[in-house]
């Protein structure tokens, strides 16, 4: 297995009904039967990176911060929406246009309202990503995650898609393959 530098692994989630002491006892007692049964379950898996692990991948962090509609459109395209432009433009319009209207109409009082519109739209893609890769609904529900941490959420989704597709890259995540043209000759008409 190849080790990655800067690869963040989020801590395991502890259910509210379980204490930290119970978790330590379970993790310090290795049992082969438990390991085998856990690997065969269909329990949701953890995300490959945490919601706040944006700085582990500076490229997606910068693009997600300065042009979130691009990352969102790329995520939607890789999840099977069939197009990049539709989700990208919808995200851009729902974020920028509604934000501008709310800001000017209320003198800045409802500046956070557009987050609700974007969250309603984006949480559907997060849900389909979780279903596709059997991921936990963490750190919160899909809507709440996008409502409070939208930029971090789309960067996390982008990192997850890239991590899951490593080794079997989709066509648009690697360099284009160009074949040389066939040799051609010209013949005279005489």
Curated annotation (Swiss-Prot):
Keywords: Membrane, Transmembrane, Transmembrane helix. One of its GO terms (cellular component) is membrane. The gene is PCR10. May be involved in cadmium resistance. It comes from Arabidopsis thaliana (Mouse-ear cress). Belongs to the cornifelin family. The keyword Transmembrane helix applies. InterPro entries: PLAC_motif_containing (IPR006461). The chain crosses the membrane at residues 78-98, 108-125. The keyword Hydrolase does not apply. It comes from the Eukaryota. Pfam families: PLAC8. It is found in: Membrane. This is Protein PLANT CADMIUM RESISTANCE 10. Its main location: membrane. It is a multi-pass membrane protein.
